[in-house]
Amino acid sequence: MRGRATKPRSHEATKERHGKATKPSRLHRDRLRHEATKGTVTRKIAFITGTRAEYGLLRSTMEAIHKGKGLQLQVVATGTHLLKKFGHTIDDVVADGWPVDARVPMQRGDDRALDQAEGLARGVAGIARFLEQAQTDIVVVLGDRIEAMAGALAGATTGRVVAHIHGGDVAAGDWDDTLRHSITKLSHLHFPATESAGRRIVRMGESADRVHVIGAPGLDRLAELVRHQRDGRHTPTITGMTRGRPADRAAAHRPSLALDASRKGEPLRVRKESRSRAIIVQHPCGRSAAHEKKVMNAVLRAVDETGLAALCIYPNSDRGHSGIVEAIEAHRRRADPERFRVVRSMARDDYLRALIEADLLIGNSSSGIIEAASAGTAVVDIGPRQRGREPSGSSIVHCDETHEAIRGAIRSALRKRPIMGGRTVYGDGNAGPRVAAVLASVPLDETLLRKTIAY
C-alpha cells in the first residue's frame, strides 16, 4: 500500500531525535546492521506504546517484526512513558535498543477525568500526523487503555490497517471493557489471547477470518525466564532468596530483597527469621482519589498484619491514582525499610524475575490473572478490576476490598502451591511470532479495510 525502499536510521538521526548524544547499545547496533541487509521495505508497521506494562507485552512482537524480511518497524511512544511522575519509562524503550520514531504527549499527569479526555484528543492528532508523514501501513495497538484507543482512532481515520492484540477480554475495571470493545470495532485484524475471547469478538460482528487466537504475549518472555530458573541460569532480582512456601519457610534463609526503581540496587533487607515475599500492584478503578486511597490503606494494613516483606509498585495513571500514591508514600515514611520498598516502575524483565521469586502477588493487576500462574506465584486479586477475566490456574484468591478480607485472602494464598511453567488457557509463550507472521503475510488491500457486520 505505502511501502517503499528506505534507509535504516543512522545513529546521528537517533541522537537528534532524542536530543542527546549517547553511544548506541550493542543491541541497537545489531538492529541497524540488520536493517541494512533487509532489502526493500514492503510494509511499515507502527507500534503504539503508552505504558511500561503494555510495552513489555508488545516487545516480543516488535522483535519478530524487526527480524521479518521486508518489514520496517516504527515505534510511537506516548502516554505515561513521557511522564517523570510515572518513571519516564521511555528510557526503558530506548535502553532496549529501539529508536523511537515519534513521541506524542497525551496526559499531563493530573488526576482529572478531563486530563484523560484532552489527552485522548492530543494523542489522536499527534499519532495521525506521524502515520501520514511516515507512510505507515499497519498500526498495532494492545489492550484497553486510552493510548491504544488513540492509536486505533488515528489509524482507522487515516485509512491504515489497525491490528488489535488482547481484544475480546472481559474485565470490570473503570472503562476497560468500553475502550477495549470500541477498539475492536475500529480494528481490521484481531489477536485475542484465548479461544473464548476470540469467540466474543466474532459475536460482536467481526468476521471470523480476521480473528487469530495467539495466546497472551505476556507469557512470551516469561516462558524463557522460567526455563532459565529451571536450568539454574536465572539472574536473581530478589537476591539470595530461595522461594519459600509455608512448609519450608522456617528453614529458608532469605537475606535480601534488592529491588530499586532508581537502579542503585539499594537492598531491602529481610530478617533471618524468613518472611514470605510479596509484590503489590494496585491500580485505580476510576473512583475518587479518596476512595482509592482508602482501598490502598486496607491493602497495606493487611500486608503489615500478615508480616510480609513487600515490594510496592506505583499504579497506572487512571483516574484516582493520586490517592493510591498518597497511601503508598505515607506508608513508606512509617514502614520498616527492611520490609517495605517502593518503586515507580520496573523494566519488564526485572518485574518478571521478581514475580518468579515472589511468594505472592497482591493487588488488581492483570499479570495476577495471566502471568502469575506460569511464574509459580500465588495471587490475591482484590476488588472488581479483573472480574470477568479467565483464570489461569487455581492459585488465585479473589477478595473484597476490606482489610479483613484481604488479610484472610493473603493467608489462604500462602497455603497454595502453584506449579511454575504449568499450562494455562493463555497459551504457550509464542504469541509475538504468531502476530508477526500474520502481519507480514496478510494482503493489504481494500477488502481488508472495508468492514461489514458479519451476522
Task: Label the model's feature ranges.
Residues 373-420:
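Nucleotide-sugar donor-binding patch of glycosyltransferase catalytic domains
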